[in-house]
From Swiss-Prot:
<dbReference type="Pfam" id="PF14958">
    <property type="entry name" value="PAAT-like"/>
</dbReference>
<comment type="subunit">
    <text>Homodimer. Interacts with ABCB7, ABCB8/MITOSUR and ABCB10.</text>
</comment>
<keyword id="KW-0496">Mitochondrion</keyword>
<comment type="function">
    <text>ATPase that regulates mitochondrial ABC transporters ABCB7, ABCB8/MITOSUR and ABCB10. Regulates mitochondrial ferric concentration and heme biosynthesis and plays a role in the maintenance of mitochondrial homeostasis and cell survival.</text>
</comment>
<dbReference type="GO" id="GO:0042802">
    <property type="term" value="F:identical protein binding"/>
</dbReference>
<feature type="compositionally biased region" description="Polar residues">
    <location>
        <begin position="280"/>
        <end position="289"/>
    </location>
</feature>
<dbReference type="GO" id="GO:0005739">
    <property type="term" value="C:mitochondrion"/>
</dbReference>
<feature type="modified residue" description="Phosphoserine">
    <location>
        <position position="254"/>
    </location>
</feature>
<feature type="region of interest" description="Disordered">
    <location>
        <begin position="424"/>
        <end position="444"/>
    </location>
</feature>
<protein>
    <recommendedName>
        <fullName>ATPase PAAT</fullName>
        <ecNumber>3.6.1.-</ecNumber>
    </recommendedName>
</protein>
<keyword id="KW-0597">Phosphoprotein</keyword>
<feature type="region of interest" description="Disordered">
    <location>
        <begin position="279"/>
        <end position="300"/>
    </location>
</feature>
<keyword id="KW-0378">Hydrolase</keyword>
<dbReference type="GO" id="GO:0016887">
    <property type="term" value="F:ATP hydrolysis activity"/>
</dbReference>
<keyword id="KW-0963">Cytoplasm</keyword>
<feature type="modified residue" description="Phosphoserine">
    <location>
        <position position="182"/>
    </location>
</feature>
<feature type="compositionally biased region" description="Basic and acidic residues">
    <location>
        <begin position="431"/>
        <end position="444"/>
    </location>
</feature>
Amino acid sequence: METAIEDAGLDRGPTLTSSWDAACGALTQSLFLTRTGPRAQDLDFEQLLEPPAPSQDPVSLKSSLSPRDENPCFIYLNCGPNGGEEILSVGVLSSARNMEVYLGEEYCGTSRGKTACTVLDDSEHEKILLYKKYLKLDSPTHACKIKLLSFGEKQCVLVSKVVVHLRPRSADPSPRSAALGSRIDLDNIQTIMESMGSRLSPGAQQLMSMIRFQQQNRLPIGDQLQSVLGSAGHKHLMALQSSPSPAVLDKASSTPFPFRTGLTPSAITENLKALIDKSAQPSGEGNTTNHDEGHLMPQNHSLESDLKNAVSSFLPKKASGSSSVPSSELLPFLQNLCSQVNHLRVGHNARWQENISKPREGMVGVPMEEQPVCSYLEKILSKNMELMEKKLMDHIDERIYQLQEHIDAKMALLVDLLRGPNSPPPGMPLRHYDSRERLSNGER
């Protein structure tokens, strides 16, 4: 393996910027690039992050806002989407003890620093410790951001080195390598829950089973959810699993997903019932689309079966073929789904607004303008929180008012006793009096 250590004074390579103020061009001088071949191996960051020569002063990053304002220190690495290289790992030698790495807005990992050396800060005339920390990314990327964390909310961070491990971008990157859920460590989550003495709810266990199946088969979890929630998403999954053609891809991309067409809980209930009923139909009663989909691999049938089982626990057993499923029982299930598929929702445009389903006649409890299910649940939760807050404040005010009346009554009784003919003379200690009343916590 050939490894080349190059300085930052190159025409090509990633750019290094910061959210805090730094001298013009000073931060770029701290950037060191490490390039390897396509089959890259791990580097020795312990050696690469060794303290520089005494003549090379660290770069000082300072916050332009007051300490009361929340303004974390970020440094940004960007190779450009059209560049020929991608980032494998990063290392930083700075006064910040820890660092967090993000791929866009997605958290990637945290690295805790080790003490490397001590430098003298000319502005403060004091010695400052520098810590070396590095992190290998789960998947190569062309851009990332690093959050530098210091204890005590310091408004100045010294950066001595930023080492970036690069390799040539692969010609045929796998689009499924960064699928949602691939970075979720389910075993670690289970261990943490057991150590806390907590148990997952049935809905959370079903969701973890779905994510585990997605990780084992390397399928995007969004496609699984679409397969559960509607026929349009189910057809989209079938098109992805079969051999792609331009016509199929165009049709799949233009097919409106259920979450993008403004579903209500009632519409989701109907889609779920249709999916369960579909499995009970005889093989000869299907339409032509079902015959065309018969050539799929067995794992597709396993996927459909597992997803049906994951949903069936949330649906009550049907007493007759004409019975309806109340949408209120799907609320916990929808709350879990909304948190997982929120990434699928983007801003509405005119094309999606045209596809919003109109309210059906005879349906009770459906608003005239059907809104996306996530917005629907958000309004319900927000209203319930406001009502809960109002009830709590009213209860507190009532208890304070009752306590004030009780104190006033006792004070008036005490004044009457002191003014009475049988009151003790001044200077004599008062006799202990027990009203036999108890406080709410049982004390007297």
